[in-house]
Structure formats: C-alpha cells, structure tokens
Amino acid sequence: MIISEKVKKALEDGIPVIALESTVIAHGLPYPHNVETAKMLEEMALENGVVPATIGILKGEIIVGMSQEQINEMLADEPLKIGTREIPYAVGMKKSAATTVSATMRIAKIAGIDVFATGGIGGVHIGDWDVSQDITEMAKSDVIVVSAGCKSILDVKKTIEFLETFQVTVVGYKTNKFPIFYEGLSDFNLEHRVDSPEDIAKIFRAKKSLGIEGALLVANPIPQEFVISEQEVDGYMKQALSECFEKGITGKAVTPYLLSRIAQLSNGKTLTSNIELLKNNVLLACQIAKSLKTMA
C-alpha cells in the first residue's frame, strides 16, 4: 500500500483526513464531469482544513491519496470496479481498479482514516438476492460513512433491514427519515437522529471505546433544492431497469448502467443532483473529521 506524502504527514501530525472513493470517478459519473467533480471535492476538503485521500488501485498498487496524474492513469487503464472481495485479485494480478464503498472502507481502515464520504451506499437490489458488499463491510470496518442514504434504485426497506441485521449503527443527520439519494427523504423512520458533527464524533468515539466493531453510517439528505420527485425518478427508473434486464446486465455493472441511463433520460438533472449531494456529504465529512480531532 502506498500512502501519499500529504496524507501520511497529515495522519502523523493529527490533521483531519477524509477518504474518497474512486468508483464515482471511474464508473459513477460520465466524462468530463467525473474528473472535474473529483478535483472539486478534493479542493472543497482542503478549503475546509481537511486533507482528502482518494483511494484506488493502479496496476496492482493500492494508493491512498491519489494524485491527478494517478487518477488519469487509472482511468486510461479501463479500471475494474471492485469491492472488498476483489482487492486481492486486483493487487495480485497487477490490475487497475476503482474502489467501491466496501473496498474504500476497508483500505481507509487499514490506513488509519476514520471518515469516508460517498454519494450513496449499495444495498439490496429490487427483485432478487443481489446484496451489496457495502453492507457486510459496514459490519466490519470501524469507519464513519457519510452518505445520502442508499441509491433509489434499491429496495430501501430491505436495505434498512439488512443494516439492522448486520448491526450497523445508523444515524440521520438533521432528519428522522432515511434518505434516498436524489429523492430526498423516504417514508422509513430512523431510530436515531443527530444535529451536529460533534454528536457524530461522540457516538463514534463511544463505539470504538466499547470495542463494538463496524461502521457508523451517517444518513445525510441531499439539499432540498436539488431533490427530484419520486414520481419523476420512478419514470426514468422503470425504463432504465427494463432496458437493463433486456440487455442482461447483472452484478456490479447494474448500478453504473442505471445511473448513466437515468442521467440521459433526465437530460442531466440527476447528474446535477448527484454532484450536489456529493459536495454536501464531503462538507459534513470534513466537519466530522475536525470534530474527531478536537475531541482527541
């Protein structure tokens, strides 16, 4: 594993660090929005006094704190999309790979990074037993995951049930409802709500001090002005899902296909919302990372 000098120095000097995934760059957003957004999110973190650490794998080397040149090289290498279980394959076979939520969490934990910002977590897909590694990894890795809930292409109720089954601590940030990506808030209640980054830091500290393993999932809704109605998203979703099944797309290829197709069908509306919720999550992650340091 290679930890960049900037990230290594920040960790040694007690400067707040947040992890960022590379899948959003390689498979989550179309070019050139992917590269532009990745750069913008890193700049946001730096402006808030936090060092960003984009995580990915380049020709078999795990890199924590990818440079722009390394990101470009990874993209040019047609990277795999990997979860935790595929990390050994990518490393052993010297492949380039973009890390999903699960893989990014595991690598962040190994590197000593406590906070990770993403768009939305994976979960239980509609109509079958396709369950994301994100959930099982959250049962193991002691990392704060800031996300806009789960993606609306999933079975939200079953995803919430699986999070409970795997004993993942979930808190809503300034909300009592579980958020669902572009659509804002779902109808599903959350048991626990917090209203400050400091409270999130307190919960995480308590979790670690008690030796209770696993992530703290912070459900942070998309800002209201960028919410897209359930009815509108459902229309795009039904068409995209139908095309997905017709094309025989399965597994990890499903989510990037659906997100890309829905962006096309919405004339870029979902793309704008996706970028805004990422910015919102990075900002909160920065506040949490700083709160953890002031408590230390």
UniProtKB/Swiss-Prot annotation:
Its EC number is 4.2.1.70. The keyword Hydrolase applies. Mn(2+) binds at D130. Its cofactor is Mn(2+). One of its GO terms (biological process) is nucleobase catabolic process. Belongs to the pseudouridine-5'-phosphate glycosidase family. Catalyzes the reversible cleavage of pseudouridine 5'-phosphate (PsiMP) to ribose 5-phosphate and uracil. Functions biologically in the cleavage direction, as part of a pseudouridine degradation pathway. This is Pseudouridine-5'-phosphate glycosidase. It comes from Fervidobacterium nodosum (strain ATCC 35602 / DSM 5306 / Rt17-B1). The lineage of its organism: Bacteria, Thermotogati, Thermotogota, Thermotogae, Thermotogales. The gene is psuG.
